[in-house]
Amino acid sequence: MTVDHSKIPSITPSPLDGAPALEPLVSRCRIVDFPKIEDARGNLTFIEGDRHVDFGIKRVYYLYDVPGGAERGGHAHKGLHQLLIAMSGSFDVVVDDGRHRQRFHLNRSYYGLYIPPMIWREIDNFSSGSVCMVLASEYYDESDYYRDQDEFKAAAGA
């Protein structure tokens, strides 16, 4: 098993006063590439928990038939790790740690977006026919959710 170094905040100099500053939590969100086996008969990509992602996979679900202009997400998790993959089509994911925001465009099935705990996420700009598959580190638990953004920001110290 590998050590997940993304869980350890980096110390970087502050551009304002020269004092050390913690790296924004949103920078822990990252694109993860998966193996891609190309063949004349079609391509194959696979994902293994604790190997390609830094967590065991306990739950898989997917979003599909999302109406044009609709948004999904709109929450954060207290302890859950997730990986979002565009299995078909494309969509955008906006991640927010309470202070910093970043937008990712997902449109390939051989890479995904890792989202650690305590990151607010919003998913929008779904193309027609898009499918978003989500790999999760835990079983569903409603108590793990922040569904109110102000409550999330207070918990995140923003």
Indicate residue ranges for each PLM-predicted region.
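Non-catalytic, conserved peripheral segments adjacent to functional cores
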Residues: 2-111, 128-129, 134-135, 140-158
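Well-ordered alpha/beta subsegment
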Residues: 108-113, 118-125
